Amino acid sequence: MALSLVLSIVMAAMNAGCSAGSQRAVPEPLAFGVLGATCEPQRLAALRGAGVSIVELPVAWDRFEPRQGRVDSQYVADVVAQLEQCRQAGIKVILSPGLHYPPAWVRELPGGELRGSKGGVSRGSGAELIFSSEVRKAAHRYLSRLVLRLGVDQGMENIAAIRVGTNSSGELGYPGPDDGGNEREFWAFGDAPQKGTGLAEGVALSPMPGWVPGSAVWNGRAVTGRQVHEWWDWYAGSAVEAVVWQVKALRSLGYQGRVHVPVAGRGVLPADKAKAVAGHLDGRANPDGAQERGLDYLAQFAVLSMVPGVDVDFTGLDDVSAAAARSTVPRQDRCSPGDEEKAVKEDVSSWSSQRYTSALARRAGLGLVGENPGPPDFPFTGGSSLSDSLAEQLRTAPGYAVDCGMTMFLFGFEENLFDDGEGGVTLDDYKEVIQQSH
């Protein structure tokens, strides 16, 4: 069944007041964790004493398999040791397999890099899991080795979730609009999506091969709004299909636990999408580059709702949009009862990203977890001069998580809790926040 048809069926059901494959868990007390864990025993003891019960452990594909077919046994042993240390400390683990850290040889595979609409190649992008058959084969082999080794040495019982995504930050979506050195670049212009050469099994070819967003003509004829809409559905749908592929790959390898899909921002708002389609995706109604990133959460969450065991991980609790929405009258930063319907029926342009995206996840029946962006001056955190400081994020973000119905809050990052307060926060600060939540 074509992905666009799946979207139509699920969206029709949701708009009728139900959610397909609803899997939202009964609300439970908020669990607290950290991102970027080392699983170092002394730190684990301190974290557990503060009330932390879960950590995110990053693994790097390029370190696991630096050469094609050659596994770094010492690195694997180190990861296994980290997991064992967490298990002994009574701390659950969210595993990040690190597909967004592909080895150089993966990028050299046929179709190994995403190609932009202006000829660019994304700098530092993750593995090209969206369209490339060869990259997906390599990724599946890597995941099978990772899961097999962890299953043999550790078992998977202490792994609370595995994170999956498609971009260089490990989140859902394509690279940013400027990641290839050009302005406003879309990312589906390699031979696989345009010609079918090396296209992954089950992935659709572009519905308008050769058409570039912004152009009013294709094959000598005027482009219709319907054609642009179909192209957008294909573009955004291909990104979420790559996430579904990863979940299915993990299931086929025997992992049956929760899967977290990190998402940032609020994606393209429905009203903005209508304007963008009318303008042939020429850049209008695109305030934050969500179009080029292919983020259409209303439709994409509908697809994820059909996959059992999936939680949305919102990565920007108390991001810059929350700081702005907090200052409006009335304030629009906090999640509120009834947001699930308001999100699709009212003007939500003044809402914070966390409020809008959480409402869509709840509407789709998906589980919800969240994390703060991290230090505003760190790369990939979306920080600006208007962002809250790390200390302000620690004070504010957990409350947002509760308001939005999340079951878990992950603080970014572990290192910032053990840097003697250089980042403005300490583990004692986090402990106080956790104690106040109970």
Question: In which residue ranges do the predicted regions lie?
Answer:
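Bacterial N-terminal signal peptides
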Residues: 4-15
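The substrate-binding groove and active-site-proximal loops of carbohydrate-active enzymes
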Residues: 29-36, 61-76, 122-141, 225-241, ...
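Hydrophobic faces of well-ordered beta-strands that scaffold small-molecule active sites
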Residues: 30-34, 55-57, 93-97, 160-164, ...
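Catalytic domains of carbohydrate-active enzymes, especially glycoside hydrolases
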Residues: 37-62, 81, 92-94, 301-313, ...
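Aromatic-lined substrate-binding rim segments of carbohydrate-active enzymes
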Residues: 42-50, 56-121, 147-151, 251-253
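Substrate-binding cleft of secreted/luminal carbohydrate-active enzymes
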Residues: 98, 102, 297-327, 331-438
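Polysaccharide-binding and catalytic clefts of secreted carbohydrate-active enzymes
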Residues: 121-303, 310
